[in-house]
Amino acid sequence: MIYLFHGSDAGKTRAKAFQWIAAARAKQPEASYLRFDATSLSEMALLNALATQGLFFKKSLILIDDPFSVAESGALVLEHLDQIQKTENIVGILAPKLLAARVKKLEAKAEKVFVCDAAEKKVRGF
């Protein structure tokens, strides 16, 4: 189950993702929480996290924080996108300023998508 957080406003996108994490942890405090950033994400760590089940709570909460900032971790997420979608764990992918081609791939697999775009500045012309 994938929740995708993206948009051109990186600050608002990050804030929305961490609000979602806080709400989910408040709702189910016994669920385990794993967070990976682009530098700590490896294939073994990702596959282990997707297969993890808690002792008292079946689902884990996993946040993959800006995986596309490092080419290898971004490729890893795209390579295992089907497994990420099919896991019983809840996976949030926080990807501010995501390229349009990647947005389409991720949105197709995501259960819910949160977009936080920067407001356009109005230019006054004469």
In which residue ranges do the predicted regions lie?
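Conserved beta/loop motifs at nucleotide-recognition and modification sites
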Residues: 1-126
